[in-house]
Amino acid sequence: MIKVGIVGGTGYTGVELLRLLAQHPQARVEVITSRSEAGVKVADMYPNLRGHYDDLQFSVPDVQRLGACDVVFFATPHGVAHALAGELLDAGTRVIDLSADFRLADAEEWARWYGQPHGAPALLDEAVYGLPEVNREKIRQARLIAVPGCYPTATQLGLIPLLEAGLADASRLIADCKSGVSGAGRGAKVGSLFCEAGESMMAYAVKGHRHLPEISQGLCRASGGDVGLTFVPHLTPMIRGIHATLYAHVADRSVDLQALFEKRYADEPFVDVMPAGSHPETRSVRGANVCRIAVHRPQGGDLVVVLSVIDNLVKGASGQALQNMNILFGLDERLGLSHAALLP
């Protein structure tokens, strides 16, 4: 049985991680931390977990207790894992970080986007970017895994086949992405209030979103060179979901794009390439660790449109983190993650 610790268990990614781990036959949550809710029972805060974690309480972070776990997940704001990850690694504990702390390979680039110095630059060289569809073999040997963000997951999975094959003009890619409000976190913010977010949609961070360098980094690796990416995120009046509409110029009209995508993801348990002409919906992935993709070439022209949808809290966060844990410990990748999406 894998002994699990969770740092920061009161946010949406934390409770989603608890929900998924409750269904995992080879993992047990030993420690969950929250400074603000120390002493509160998990099941009292989240009644949906009653019967699964009735005796588990939030506690103040303690490196000794966390270090006794086999793996510790960080479901925290950026900057928190910087301070604790090194001590846990020294204790022999593996770390899976759901925050942005170790996603970017360049400490200075991270500092520019997050407005503070990187707190653990010495760990960046060994941090493995936890996108299993790209880095599965590296994940198996990792001590420190950086779980990709939600927008980066949907965008990279949608564009990687075109870039790996050298088909797309990498200098002019567009990612037009929509997110549910849970992507903004559980903290109280005016923009997340029902009366502000309901019955409305808006673009934000058009000048530059923190996920932009992460997406660009992954696409550069896929293409083997520089990329030019325009990324525009939008907030939509739904709780869960990412819908990415991706545009790429592909001059070669003889390529069977459907076959290309199907071949690339044929052995991927959590990527579903839908039949030609499909339009994947966010509701089709709600609660599931899956990315559904459809590829189109409108009017047979040079512009290819890829539609990519995920649940931002599952394949875009906690589910992908659990997928990484399964790989890391040599388990079936699908363990605890094979349930169907929720409909309606």
Swiss-Prot record:
SMART domains (alphabetical): Semialdhyde_dh (SM00859)
E.C. designation(s): 1.2.1.38
Alphabetized UniProt keyword annotations: Amino-acid biosynthesis, Arginine biosynthesis, Cytoplasm, NADP, Oxidoreductase
Catalytic activity: N-acetyl-L-glutamate 5-semialdehyde + phosphate + NADP(+) = N-acetyl-L-glutamyl 5-phosphate + NADPH + H(+)
Localization, UniProt: Cytoplasm
Parts forming coiled coils: none
One GO location term (cellular component): cytoplasm
An example Gene Ontology biological process: L-arginine biosynthetic process
Enzyme class: oxidoreductase
Annotated PROSITE patterns: ARGC (PS01224)
Pathway per the UniProt entry: Amino-acid biosynthesis; L-arginine biosynthesis; N(2)-acetyl-L-ornithine from L-glutamate: step 3/4
Molecular function as annotated in GO: N-acetyl-gamma-glutamyl-phosphate reductase activity; NAD binding; NADP+ binding
Catalytic site positions: 150
Function: Catalyzes the NADPH-dependent reduction of N-acetyl-5-glutamyl phosphate to yield N-acetyl-L-glutamate 5-semialdehyde.
Family from the record: Belongs to the NAGSA dehydrogenase family. Type 1 subfamily.
Protein name according to UniProt: N-acetyl-gamma-glutamyl-phosphate reductase
Organismal lineage: Bacteria, Pseudomonadati, Pseudomonadota, Gammaproteobacteria, Pseudomonadales
Gene: argC
